[in-house]
Amino acid sequence: MAVEEKNSPTGAAMTNTGILVPSSQQSLPEWWTKTQKFFSRENTITPTFGYFRLLFGTQPGKTDIALIVIGTIAGIGAGIPFPLLGILFGELVDDLNSSTCSTTQAPPGGYQAAITTKVLQVIYVSILNFVCMYIHTGCWSMVGERLVRRLRTKYFHSLLRQEIAFTDTLPSGDVTSRLVSDIEVIQAGTSEKVGLFIGTISYFVAAYIVAFLKVATIAAMLMSVVPIYFLMAFGGGHYIKKYSGRISTHINAATSIVSSSLSHMSIVHAFNANARLEALFAQHLVSARMDALKKAITHSIQFGMLYFVAYASNALAFWQGSRMIADLAEGKPSKVSVGAVYTVIFVLLDASFVLSQMAPFMHIFASAASAGDRLMTTIKRQSAIDGTSSEGDSTISLASEEIELQDVTFNYPARPEVPVLQGVSFKIPPNKHTAIVGTSGSGKSTVVALLERLYDPITGCVRVGNRDLKEINVRHLRGSIGLVQQEPNLLDRSILENIAHGLVSSSQEKHKHLLPTLLGPSLSELTEKIRQGASEDEAVTEQGDVVREIVNLTRHAATLSNAIDFINALPDGLATRVGSSGAELSGGQKQRIALARALIRDPPVLLLDEATAALDSTSERLIQAALNKVSENVTTVSIAHRLATAKDADNIIVMQKGRVMEQGTHMDLVARDGVYAGMVRLQNIGKFSSSSSIMTESTQVDANIDRSLTTDTLLNKEEKLSLEQGVLDEKEKPAQLYMPEEADSLPTEPENEKEKPKQTLWATMKGSFPLIRPNILLISLGLITSIMIGVSYTGEAVIFGHTVGSLSVCRGGPSIRSSGMLFGLLFFILAIVKFAAVIVNGAAFGWAAEKTLYRTRVLSLRSLLRQPLEWHNADGRTPGLLVALVTSDASALSSLTGTTIGVLFSTVANLFAGVILSQCHRMEDSRSPSGYLTRIKHQKAYAKATAITVESVDNIKSIAAFSLEQEAYSVFNRSLKAPYKSNMKSVLHGNFWLSLAYSISTLVYALAYWWGSQQILAGMYTQVQFFIVLPALLFSTQSCGQMFALVPDISKARIAASNIVDLLSIKHEGDEEYDKTGSKASAKHTDPRFNMLEDKPRDVEAQLITTTPSSFPTKGMGVQFRNVHFRYPSRPNQPALDDLSINISPGQFCALVGPSGSGKSTTFALLEKFYNPASGSIIIDGVDITKQSGAAFRDTIALVPQENVMFEGTVAFNIGLGARPDVEATQEEIEEACRLANIHDTIAALPDGYNTVCSQDGKQFSGGQRQRLSIARALVRKPRLLLLDESTSALDVESEKHVQDALAKVARKTTIVAIAHRLNTIHRADRIFMIERGRCVDQGTHAELVERCESYRANVIHQSLDA
């Protein structure tokens, strides 16, 4: 249960890192602190220490201490009653034995009274057992829930404070795996199962105590096998932990592939890359599968040995007990009785049985310890640059301070062999504009990262005034800087919250009072109310004056960044959610929001890394004018490839290959005729116009006008420009084109899923059967051995009954000895049989489970990758939830072919065998009710918190740059409250039924004893019959309790199976034809959805050879848009294309230009058939693709997206993804494409060359390098139609020149359509289409449009460098 503390409104205290942590950790007893320190040590000698470190090394609070203590005491108490029952049952045996051996004809009434009294005592003890069990399962369930919540917060806290270098080297998919798989494993291993295990150990110890008190000789003999139990537990745990670590590594990589693929579905579709991604995914799964099999076999051997030792020790006990009873029967001196021997054998037999039933728990605990160690490694890691720390000088002001880099060298940790900066030295004067230009990969963005102290130099230093940057408090430093990144990352919040993030760590004193509101839920609640229909003014008034001040500051910043008009045009205005990383906005919109976020804090230092690269020239010009106005007393550092945006800088620094080549003003550098002058010549668009002198004159006039404009006048001018008004209809969302709409919003259940009726159990089973069918022989073997295991309990009962019956003193000593030896031998044989059965069972089900898991995951990913974008764009259907289908749901389903189904079948076999045995011996008490099972609801809790964590890590540079660690932490904690509260409530009623299920066996046993004893006393049944049925019923009811504990897993698997069957049941275009993700059906009746890759999938990274290299086509494609209308499904009231008509002839180089949001990228989306138009025709090579099924036409189309995407895999694999589906690109073809894209030399210089592994999104490469890799991926396809969406926006002029020359060669036999804001890249186009408001308003050559199109001419003038 949650305990609110008084230290803060959230029940937390502030640490020296500035992050809120639970205040219950304060003022703990000294002994508890010492315990924590002991278990916090990195002692990994045994899994036991790892497990205790998990429990006690995470700073549990007072409530946790109380729950652990109470739960442990109750667990110990729950284990004691049954050995006490053994004493009572032993006395009952003596009473029954005396009765049956008596010569009196009628049963004495005293025996009946004694038996009734003891049965009542049994019932009382059973009630006590239930109470103790309910308490300990409840306490430990809450301990587990609180522990995983604590681990989540600590892990997230640790991730937030780590330096960027750490996250750069973090394995792809690692965070998702930690927060989904590992947390789930930890919760399973630290909840009610701990209480059950403690109760079992208590039972085991108490049983031996009772045994020693009753018959010390037998107890001492059996005590010798106890070390073997622990040896098996710890030895097996060691190997299980070893294999779990290996599995985790492979699964992390596989999960990364799934995540990146589902996040960039348009790229997957554009290149038909699903088969190659699926194959790479399968490779990782195969590697994990072998380790999983070893883990399963290890577990089964561990389990089997525990059974063998338990049964073998019971065989010894039977034999020794029979000898003692024989001595007693022969009148030899003996202090034992039949009841005493029975008590010893009974309690030790049952204790061994229960302990063996706990063997699966050892596997769970070992896995939890292993998962805990993985989390604790990150949690305890000390950050080299802690943005949350209070250390360092927080008083220094960056205003009017000179910034200097002194002989700085640097290389990124992910690629330590590659130098990025080499002896860089330059000064940045205060209150001046310094521009940094140069080739892509020259270190420009790295300089910005060092100024923000996202990294520290390897040698040299960065100084502010006379202070080293390391001496300044990191949070204070970053709070004094406004940053606009090359690829702006926004968090999945509203526009208001994203812009207001700039105020969170502002160094301005006037913003300090806003911090509590910024960290609280007020802005989130405000935007939610607006989205629900409330007016902005009313909602703001309700929230108070501070919120109104934040809203006003936000609007002012949005005005300065030229974003206010498109914001006002959105249905929810400032309350509009931007999606994960701003996926709901276009590239230009995101840049303007990011600029507003930087400007809102009124920073003394402004860092602009390609801040206007995604904007059209008019928008860029307006923003530049606004920046000139607000940066008069600001130190501004800008990085630019468009030299027009840098020419007015006070100082321009030119960099190449990590060195400063030259610096000075624009005029000085042009006069030197050096590197910069060459860049100017390459980029100057003025020379391409016949009206160059006119443009130069116009540029000078406009420059003078711009300097005289106030911000208000500027915005009035903007409203009159038809170009910028096109932004009001900004629906094309270029970022969204390559990322499904609402792609990474926080996981919620899709509306259509909520309304869809659930599948029946039969439909689910029928749909799941094709997944299981290939493993039917393994499953059959597992089921046979499960039945053998289940029936073995009945065999045990038969042997036990005959043994107890044969130990009656009514029989002679020799008979007792021979019977004891016989049944002891039978018990030993049973031990051997069960040992073999358990091993075969574990191996068979383990291998079947892994093969089913492999098949299910690959088929699920296949189905997901084949769904159209509109399916992925459905409301609430997010990559986060879809990844769960491939990972969590597939894993849950596979449990039905693994240990869960094995235990279930052995339990059912045990139950039926016990009932049948009871009926064979005509015991009426077997018809007594044994209780009912209750289904536990399966919950997908914490998905939102996981999504927040993954999003924060993906955007960690933005989080760090704006010191949003505390804000992200606050949002994260708020997301935990609802599922935490819900789960804690479920503990109360869920554990009631669990405790009842485990305790019911004792009551059934008491009832059976009472009824059976009456039958024996009445002379209707024999002792042998009674003692056969009694343990059979006991084992059956105990197995029912264990089966009840499996109900959550079975329920989980049932839901998972339903989800997966639903997914696989979706029909796709071409199911009846060749399945490109697999192979042709082997028979006509075979469902192609279940076609599988080979058991050993092809190595897609190694298989880069083909017998016949492909060649460039001889003819390009013709393209026509005829009266096309289109609206995005998410915004049906706003047109994206409005009667668009264009005609592109085969082999032409055509360009689409126009303002941001005018519909340019939407044309590409329709050309790729990501969507179908509402009306009109799209004709490619004479075929209307809107009326054709399938997308085979994409095989000869290549796309270079605006936002460049890399997948998990080598560089060669990423480029090879672009090859046509039926061709594997050769190494020569890959290198040729890279040379054309001017990236070959960069790749060749890497230590691993083309085998260099790209992390998810290729974050170890610069923006320009990723763009060239994307171009190479498109060129390796050798397309007939090449689509370029701002394909050179991140390139320097030299790289751009190389790429343009390469495209000129390709263009001879290929149709090229380019979207561009840099007009110098398309001035040679055969035809340029001017797109505004979803229509083509003009078309012609560059020269023709300069002459007659005013808006086009204005853009040319702005980009000219002749002035």
UniProtKB/Swiss-Prot annotation:
Glycans are attached at N97, N552, N633, N973. It comes from Trichophyton tonsurans (strain CBS 112818) (Scalp ringworm fungus). The chain crosses the membrane at residues 65-85, 119-139, 193-213, 215-235, 301-321, 336-356, 781-801, 820-840, 896-916, 992-1012, 1016-1036. This is ABC multidrug transporter MDR2. Keywords: ATP-binding, Cell membrane, Glycoprotein, Membrane, Nucleotide-binding, Repeat, Transmembrane, Transmembrane helix, Transport. GO terms for molecular function: ABC-type oligopeptide transporter activity; ATP binding; ATP hydrolysis activity. Residues 738-758 are annotated as: Disordered. Residues 69-367, 781-1052 form the ABC transmembrane type-1 domain. It comes from the Eukaryota. It is found in: Cell membrane. Induction: Expression is induced upon exposure the allylamine terbinafine and the azole itraconazole. It holds the Pfam family ABC_membrane. Belongs to the ABC transporter superfamily. ABCB family. Multidrug resistance exporter (TC 3.A.1.201) subfamily. One of its GO terms (cellular component) is plasma membrane. InterPro entries: AAA+_ATPase, ABC1_TM_dom, ABC1_TM_sf, ABC_transporter-like_ATP-bd, ABC_transporter-like_CS, P-loop_NTPase, Type_1_exporter. Residues 403-682, 1119-1358 form the ABC transporter domain. Signal peptide: none annotated. GO terms for biological process: oligopeptide export from mitochondrion. Pleiotropic ABC efflux transporter that may be involved in the modulation susceptibility to a wide range of unrelated cytotoxic compounds. ATP binds at residues 438-445, 1154-1161. It is a multi-pass membrane protein. Gene3D superfamilies: ABC transporter type 1, transmembrane domain, P-loop containing nucleotide triphosphate hydrolases.
